[in-house]
Amino acid sequence: MGHLLRRTDLPHRQIVNEKGWVSHDLNEIYRNTVQTVKTLVAESGVAPETIAGIGISNQRETTAIWDKATGKPLEEAIVWQCGRASGIAQEIAEQGHAEEIREATGLQLSAYFPAAKMAWLLRNGGEERQKRAADGELCLGTIDSWLVYKLTGDHAFKTDFSNASRTQLFNLKTLAWDEKICEMFGIPVCALARVCDSDAVYGTTTMEGLFSEPVPICGVLGDSHAALFGQGCLKPGMIKATYGTGSSLMMNIGDKPIQSSHGVVTSLAWGRGGKVDYVLEGNLNYTGAVITWLKDDLKLISSAKETEGLAGEANPADRTYLVPAFTGLGAPYWDEKATASISGITRTTGTVSYTHLRAHETSQDL
Protein backbone atom coordinates (compact mmCIF):
# COMPACT_ATOMS: atom_id res chain seq x y z
CA MET A 1 0.00 0.00 0.00
CA GLY A 2 1.42 3.36 -1.03
CA HIS A 3 1.17 6.61 0.90
CA LEU A 4 0.58 10.19 -0.17
CA LEU A 5 3.78 12.24 -0.41
CA ARG A 6 2.34 15.53 -1.57
CA ARG A 7 -0.61 17.07 -3.36
CA THR A 8 -1.07 20.27 -5.30
CA ASP A 9 -3.87 21.86 -7.28
CA LEU A 10 -4.68 24.83 -9.49
CA PRO A 11 -8.18 26.24 -10.04
CA HIS A 12 -9.47 26.84 -13.53
CA ARG A 13 -12.11 29.37 -14.47
CA GLN A 14 -15.81 28.64 -14.34
CA ILE A 15 -16.98 30.56 -17.39
CA VAL A 16 -20.66 31.50 -17.05
CA ASN A 17 -22.34 33.73 -19.63
CA GLU A 18 -25.50 35.82 -19.40
CA LYS A 19 -27.62 32.81 -20.37
CA GLY A 20 -26.24 30.78 -17.47
CA TRP A 21 -24.27 28.47 -19.78
CA VAL A 22 -21.24 26.99 -18.03
CA SER A 23 -18.01 26.41 -19.96
CA HIS A 24 -14.36 25.48 -19.35
CA ASP A 25 -11.26 26.49 -21.29
CA LEU A 26 -9.72 23.24 -22.54
CA ASN A 27 -6.25 24.69 -23.01
CA GLU A 28 -6.35 26.11 -19.48
CA ILE A 29 -7.20 22.66 -18.10
CA TYR A 30 -4.29 21.13 -20.01
CA ARG A 31 -1.82 23.85 -18.92
CA ASN A 32 -2.91 23.50 -15.29
CA THR A 33 -2.50 19.72 -15.48
CA VAL A 34 1.09 20.00 -16.70
CA GLN A 35 1.93 22.77 -14.23
CA THR A 36 0.55 20.90 -11.21
CA VAL A 37 2.61 17.82 -12.08
CA LYS A 38 5.75 19.94 -12.44
CA THR A 39 5.05 21.67 -9.12
CA LEU A 40 4.30 18.36 -7.44
CA VAL A 41 7.58 16.82 -8.58
CA ALA A 42 9.55 19.90 -7.50
CA GLU A 43 7.94 20.15 -4.05
CA SER A 44 7.91 16.42 -3.26
CA GLY A 45 11.59 15.88 -4.00
CA VAL A 46 10.78 12.81 -6.07
CA ALA A 47 13.25 12.16 -8.88
CA PRO A 48 11.31 12.25 -12.18
CA GLU A 49 13.08 9.13 -13.43
CA THR A 50 11.60 7.10 -10.54
CA ILE A 51 8.00 7.77 -11.57
CA ALA A 52 6.58 4.50 -12.90
CA GLY A 53 3.19 5.60 -14.17
CA ILE A 54 0.50 8.26 -14.31
CA GLY A 55 -3.23 7.96 -13.68
CA ILE A 56 -6.03 10.31 -14.71
CA SER A 57 -9.21 10.87 -12.71
CA ASN A 58 -11.42 13.42 -14.43
CA GLN A 59 -14.67 15.32 -14.06
CA ARG A 60 -17.24 13.33 -16.00
CA GLU A 61 -19.80 14.48 -18.58
CA THR A 62 -17.97 17.72 -19.43
CA THR A 63 -17.81 17.58 -23.23
CA ALA A 64 -15.19 18.81 -25.69
CA ILE A 65 -14.67 19.09 -29.44
CA TRP A 66 -11.31 19.57 -31.12
CA ASP A 67 -9.48 19.16 -34.41
CA LYS A 68 -7.99 15.67 -34.62
CA ALA A 69 -4.97 16.82 -36.66
CA THR A 70 -4.02 20.01 -34.82
CA GLY A 71 -5.46 19.47 -31.33
CA LYS A 72 -7.07 22.90 -31.46
CA PRO A 73 -10.38 23.15 -29.57
CA LEU A 74 -13.26 24.32 -31.74
CA GLU A 75 -15.19 25.64 -28.72
CA GLU A 76 -14.92 25.85 -24.97
CA ALA A 77 -15.96 22.63 -23.25
CA ILE A 78 -19.59 22.34 -22.13
CA VAL A 79 -19.51 21.64 -18.40
CA TRP A 80 -21.55 18.78 -16.96
CA GLN A 81 -23.73 21.27 -15.07
CA CYS A 82 -24.67 23.21 -18.21
CA GLY A 83 -28.19 22.73 -19.55
CA ARG A 84 -27.84 24.48 -22.92
CA ALA A 85 -28.55 21.21 -24.77
CA SER A 86 -31.84 20.52 -22.99
CA GLY A 87 -33.81 21.32 -26.14
CA ILE A 88 -32.01 18.53 -28.00
CA ALA A 89 -32.78 16.04 -25.23
CA GLN A 90 -36.41 17.16 -25.39
CA GLU A 91 -36.48 16.57 -29.17
CA ILE A 92 -35.25 13.01 -28.69
CA ALA A 93 -37.83 12.44 -25.95
CA GLU A 94 -40.64 13.71 -28.17
CA GLN A 95 -39.56 11.23 -30.83
CA GLY A 96 -40.29 8.47 -28.30
CA HIS A 97 -36.72 7.24 -27.76
CA ALA A 98 -36.26 7.88 -24.02
CA GLU A 99 -36.97 4.35 -22.80
CA GLU A 100 -34.98 2.74 -25.60
CA ILE A 101 -31.99 4.89 -24.67
CA ARG A 102 -32.35 4.08 -20.97
CA GLU A 103 -32.52 0.34 -21.69
CA ALA A 104 -29.36 0.44 -23.79
CA THR A 105 -27.23 2.94 -21.86
CA GLY A 106 -28.64 2.72 -18.32
CA LEU A 107 -29.10 6.50 -18.25
CA GLN A 108 -32.18 8.70 -18.06
CA LEU A 109 -32.46 10.84 -21.19
CA SER A 110 -31.01 14.17 -20.09
CA ALA A 111 -28.83 17.04 -21.30
CA TYR A 112 -26.74 16.31 -18.19
CA PHE A 113 -24.98 13.61 -20.23
CA PRO A 114 -22.60 14.27 -23.16
CA ALA A 115 -24.76 12.90 -26.01
CA ALA A 116 -26.96 16.01 -26.19
CA LYS A 117 -23.94 18.24 -25.52
CA MET A 118 -22.06 16.67 -28.44
CA ALA A 119 -25.08 17.15 -30.68
CA TRP A 120 -25.22 20.82 -29.64
CA LEU A 121 -21.51 21.30 -30.43
CA LEU A 122 -21.99 19.85 -33.90
CA ARG A 123 -25.15 21.83 -34.63
CA ASN A 124 -23.58 25.03 -33.37
CA GLY A 125 -20.83 24.68 -35.96
CA GLY A 126 -23.23 24.23 -38.85
CA GLU A 127 -23.07 21.84 -41.79
CA GLU A 128 -19.33 22.24 -42.30
CA ARG A 129 -18.53 21.06 -38.77
CA GLN A 130 -20.97 18.17 -39.05
CA LYS A 131 -19.33 17.07 -42.31
CA ARG A 132 -15.86 17.27 -40.80
CA ALA A 133 -17.01 15.11 -37.90
CA ALA A 134 -18.49 12.55 -40.30
CA ASP A 135 -15.20 12.54 -42.24
CA GLY A 136 -13.26 11.66 -39.09
CA GLU A 137 -11.50 15.02 -38.82
CA LEU A 138 -12.86 15.98 -35.39
CA CYS A 139 -12.75 14.50 -31.90
CA LEU A 140 -15.78 14.52 -29.61
CA GLY A 141 -14.88 13.43 -26.11
CA THR A 142 -14.78 13.93 -22.38
CA ILE A 143 -11.96 15.53 -20.37
CA ASP A 144 -10.05 12.27 -19.94
CA SER A 145 -9.79 11.75 -23.70
CA TRP A 146 -8.73 15.39 -24.16
CA LEU A 147 -5.91 15.02 -21.62
CA VAL A 148 -4.77 11.67 -23.03
CA TYR A 149 -4.72 13.19 -26.52
CA LYS A 150 -2.71 16.22 -25.40
CA LEU A 151 -0.29 14.38 -23.12
CA THR A 152 0.65 11.50 -25.40
CA GLY A 153 3.22 12.02 -28.11
CA ASP A 154 1.17 10.19 -30.72
CA HIS A 155 -2.05 12.05 -29.84
CA ALA A 156 -3.87 8.90 -28.73
CA PHE A 157 -7.65 9.37 -28.80
CA LYS A 158 -8.85 6.99 -26.10
CA THR A 159 -11.28 6.82 -23.20
CA ASP A 160 -12.12 4.23 -20.56
CA PHE A 161 -15.26 2.23 -19.83
CA SER A 162 -16.36 4.43 -16.92
CA ASN A 163 -16.29 7.64 -18.95
CA ALA A 164 -17.75 6.03 -22.08
CA SER A 165 -20.69 4.70 -20.08
CA ARG A 166 -21.58 8.24 -19.00
CA THR A 167 -21.92 9.64 -22.53
CA GLN A 168 -25.42 8.17 -23.15
CA LEU A 169 -24.00 6.71 -26.38
CA PHE A 170 -22.43 3.51 -25.01
CA ASN A 171 -24.35 0.23 -24.89
CA LEU A 172 -23.93 -1.48 -21.51
CA LYS A 173 -24.64 -4.93 -22.93
CA THR A 174 -22.55 -4.93 -26.12
CA LEU A 175 -19.84 -2.77 -24.49
CA ALA A 176 -19.54 -0.71 -27.65
CA TRP A 177 -20.75 2.60 -29.02
CA ASP A 178 -24.42 2.16 -29.89
CA GLU A 179 -24.66 3.13 -33.56
CA LYS A 180 -28.44 3.52 -33.46
CA ILE A 181 -28.35 5.92 -30.52
CA CYS A 182 -25.43 7.80 -32.05
CA GLU A 183 -27.56 8.26 -35.16
CA MET A 184 -30.47 9.59 -33.06
CA PHE A 185 -28.22 12.35 -31.75
CA GLY A 186 -26.41 12.89 -35.04
CA ILE A 187 -23.04 11.78 -33.64
CA PRO A 188 -20.67 9.99 -36.07
CA VAL A 189 -19.08 6.98 -34.35
CA CYS A 190 -15.78 7.84 -36.06
CA ALA A 191 -15.66 11.06 -34.00
CA LEU A 192 -15.70 9.12 -30.71
CA ALA A 193 -12.73 7.79 -28.77
CA ARG A 194 -11.52 4.21 -28.69
CA VAL A 195 -12.76 2.60 -25.45
CA CYS A 196 -10.13 0.81 -23.34
CA ASP A 197 -9.90 -0.96 -20.00
CA SER A 198 -9.50 1.51 -17.15
CA ASP A 199 -6.15 -0.08 -16.27
CA ALA A 200 -4.83 -0.13 -19.85
CA VAL A 201 -1.75 1.73 -21.04
CA TYR A 202 -3.11 4.74 -22.94
CA GLY A 203 0.23 5.95 -24.24
CA THR A 204 3.30 7.66 -22.83
CA THR A 205 4.13 11.25 -21.95
CA THR A 206 7.16 13.36 -21.12
CA MET A 207 4.89 15.96 -19.50
CA GLU A 208 6.33 18.62 -21.82
CA GLY A 209 9.93 17.66 -21.11
CA LEU A 210 9.68 17.06 -17.36
CA PHE A 211 10.56 13.38 -17.79
CA SER A 212 13.73 12.47 -19.67
CA GLU A 213 12.10 9.17 -20.65
CA PRO A 214 8.40 8.80 -21.52
CA VAL A 215 6.20 7.64 -18.62
CA PRO A 216 3.11 5.49 -19.31
CA ILE A 217 -0.40 6.75 -18.65
CA CYS A 218 -1.67 3.50 -17.21
CA GLY A 219 -4.99 4.28 -15.58
CA VAL A 220 -8.07 6.36 -16.41
CA LEU A 221 -11.31 6.62 -14.40
CA GLY A 222 -14.12 9.10 -14.07
CA ASP A 223 -13.83 10.88 -10.72
CA SER A 224 -16.80 9.25 -9.01
CA HIS A 225 -15.69 5.79 -10.14
CA ALA A 226 -12.15 6.52 -8.94
CA ALA A 227 -13.62 7.44 -5.55
CA LEU A 228 -15.51 4.12 -5.47
CA PHE A 229 -12.31 2.25 -6.26
CA GLY A 230 -10.20 4.32 -3.87
CA GLN A 231 -12.63 3.68 -1.01
CA GLY A 232 -12.23 -0.05 -1.61
CA CYS A 233 -15.79 -0.66 -2.83
CA LEU A 234 -14.73 -3.60 -4.98
CA LYS A 235 -17.55 -6.01 -4.13
CA PRO A 236 -21.29 -5.91 -4.95
CA GLY A 237 -23.31 -4.02 -2.36
CA MET A 238 -20.48 -1.73 -1.28
CA ILE A 239 -21.40 1.95 -1.54
CA LYS A 240 -19.76 5.37 -1.23
CA ALA A 241 -20.96 8.98 -1.09
CA THR A 242 -18.92 11.81 -2.61
CA TYR A 243 -19.59 15.45 -1.78
CA GLY A 244 -18.02 17.94 -4.18
CA THR A 245 -19.22 20.52 -6.69
CA GLY A 246 -22.07 18.08 -7.17
CA SER A 247 -22.62 14.88 -5.24
CA SER A 248 -22.72 11.20 -6.06
CA LEU A 249 -24.09 8.20 -4.23
CA MET A 250 -22.70 5.10 -5.99
CA MET A 251 -23.02 1.36 -5.33
CA ASN A 252 -21.05 -1.50 -6.85
CA ILE A 253 -23.54 -4.03 -8.29
CA GLY A 254 -21.08 -6.56 -9.72
CA ASP A 255 -20.65 -7.95 -13.20
CA LYS A 256 -24.26 -7.67 -14.44
CA PRO A 257 -26.26 -4.47 -15.07
CA ILE A 258 -29.39 -3.76 -13.03
CA GLN A 259 -31.99 -1.22 -14.15
CA SER A 260 -33.53 0.85 -11.37
CA SER A 261 -37.17 1.97 -11.43
CA HIS A 262 -36.53 4.68 -8.82
CA GLY A 263 -34.64 7.33 -10.76
CA VAL A 264 -31.04 6.24 -10.23
CA VAL A 265 -28.92 5.31 -13.24
CA THR A 266 -26.77 2.34 -14.24
CA SER A 267 -23.20 2.79 -15.45
CA LEU A 268 -19.97 0.87 -15.77
CA ALA A 269 -17.76 1.05 -12.71
CA TRP A 270 -14.59 0.24 -14.63
CA GLY A 271 -12.98 -2.28 -16.92
CA ARG A 272 -10.07 -4.29 -15.52
CA GLY A 273 -8.25 -7.18 -17.09
CA GLY A 274 -10.85 -7.57 -19.83
CA LYS A 275 -13.79 -7.68 -17.39
CA VAL A 276 -16.25 -4.98 -16.33
CA ASP A 277 -18.27 -4.17 -13.22
CA TYR A 278 -21.42 -2.07 -13.01
CA VAL A 279 -22.78 0.53 -10.59
CA LEU A 280 -26.03 2.20 -9.60
CA GLU A 281 -25.69 5.93 -9.01
CA GLY A 282 -27.71 8.93 -7.91
CA ASN A 283 -26.33 12.33 -8.92
CA LEU A 284 -27.06 15.77 -7.49
CA ASN A 285 -26.13 18.70 -9.72
CA TYR A 286 -25.42 21.39 -7.13
CA THR A 287 -24.09 20.78 -3.64
CA GLY A 288 -20.61 22.21 -2.98
CA ALA A 289 -21.15 24.57 -5.92
CA VAL A 290 -23.64 26.41 -3.71
CA ILE A 291 -20.64 27.71 -1.73
CA THR A 292 -19.22 29.21 -4.93
CA TRP A 293 -22.59 30.87 -5.56
CA LEU A 294 -22.62 32.36 -2.06
CA LYS A 295 -19.09 33.69 -2.56
CA ASP A 296 -18.97 34.82 -6.19
CA ASP A 297 -22.56 35.87 -6.88
CA LEU A 298 -24.20 36.82 -3.58
CA LYS A 299 -20.90 38.11 -2.08
CA LEU A 300 -21.99 36.85 1.35
CA ILE A 301 -18.61 35.25 2.05
CA SER A 302 -15.07 35.81 0.79
CA SER A 303 -13.88 32.21 1.17
CA ALA A 304 -15.38 28.76 1.70
CA LYS A 305 -13.72 28.55 5.12
CA GLU A 306 -16.08 31.20 6.49
CA THR A 307 -19.11 28.92 6.19
CA GLU A 308 -18.13 26.78 9.18
CA GLY A 309 -18.15 29.69 11.62
CA LEU A 310 -21.36 31.13 10.18
CA ALA A 311 -23.06 27.75 10.40
CA GLY A 312 -22.20 27.68 14.09
CA GLU A 313 -23.88 31.06 14.57
CA ALA A 314 -27.10 30.12 12.80
CA ASN A 315 -30.34 29.75 14.73
CA PRO A 316 -31.22 26.02 14.73
CA ALA A 317 -34.91 26.97 14.83
CA ASP A 318 -34.64 28.83 11.50
CA ARG A 319 -36.52 26.80 8.88
CA THR A 320 -35.10 28.59 5.82
CA TYR A 321 -33.98 26.11 3.18
CA LEU A 322 -32.66 26.10 -0.36
CA VAL A 323 -33.52 23.86 -3.30
CA PRO A 324 -30.29 24.30 -5.35
CA ALA A 325 -31.80 23.48 -8.74
CA PHE A 326 -29.63 26.01 -10.58
CA THR A 327 -29.41 23.64 -13.55
CA GLY A 328 -32.50 21.56 -12.83
CA LEU A 329 -32.83 18.58 -10.52
CA GLY A 330 -30.79 15.40 -10.84
CA ALA A 331 -31.67 11.98 -9.46
CA PRO A 332 -34.30 10.83 -8.86
CA TYR A 333 -36.36 13.61 -10.52
CA TRP A 334 -34.36 14.42 -13.69
CA ASP A 335 -36.29 17.66 -14.08
CA GLU A 336 -34.27 20.01 -16.29
CA LYS A 337 -36.91 22.75 -16.08
CA ALA A 338 -36.78 23.04 -12.29
CA THR A 339 -35.21 26.21 -10.91
CA ALA A 340 -33.62 27.03 -7.58
CA SER A 341 -35.75 28.42 -4.77
CA ILE A 342 -35.45 29.57 -1.18
CA SER A 343 -38.32 28.85 1.20
CA GLY A 344 -39.14 29.60 4.79
CA ILE A 345 -37.87 33.20 4.84
CA THR A 346 -39.10 35.28 7.79
CA ARG A 347 -38.34 38.76 9.16
CA THR A 348 -35.48 37.29 11.19
CA THR A 349 -33.74 35.74 8.18
CA GLY A 350 -30.33 37.38 7.63
CA THR A 351 -26.85 36.78 6.23
CA VAL A 352 -26.08 33.99 8.68
CA SER A 353 -29.29 32.23 7.72
CA TYR A 354 -28.47 32.44 4.02
CA THR A 355 -25.03 30.93 4.45
CA HIS A 356 -26.50 28.16 6.58
CA LEU A 357 -29.26 27.29 4.11
CA ARG A 358 -30.27 23.68 4.28
CA ALA A 359 -29.61 22.20 0.84
CA HIS A 360 -33.00 20.52 0.46
CA GLU A 361 -32.10 18.45 -2.61
CA THR A 362 -29.04 17.06 -0.85
CA SER A 363 -30.61 16.32 2.52
CA GLN A 364 -33.74 14.77 1.07
CA ASP A 365 -32.12 12.59 -1.58
CA LEU A 366 -28.92 11.49 0.13
Protein language model regions, located:
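A conserved helix-loop-beta module that forms one wall/lid of the active-site cleft
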Residues: 179-200
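N-terminal glycine/serine-rich phosphate-binding loop of ATP-dependent small-molecule kinases
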Residues: 1-75, 103, 211-219, 349
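Short beta-strand-loop/turn "lid" adjacent to the catalytic site in phosphate-handling enzymes
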Residues: 43-80, 108-114, 148-171, 196, ...
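Short, conserved phosphate/pyrophosphate- and ester-handling motifs at nucleotide-, phospho-/glycolipid
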Residues: 25, 82, 223
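A generic structural motif
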Residues: 10-13, 80, 264
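Active-site core segments that coordinate phosphate-bearing ligands/cofactors
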Residues: 86, 92-107, 112, 116-157, ...
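Short, acidic/turn-prone active-site loops that include or flank metal/cofactor-
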Residues: 15, 78-85, 246-247
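A glycine- and small-aliphatic-rich helix-loop capping segment at beta-alpha/alpha-beta transitions
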Residues: 2, 66-76, 234, 254-263
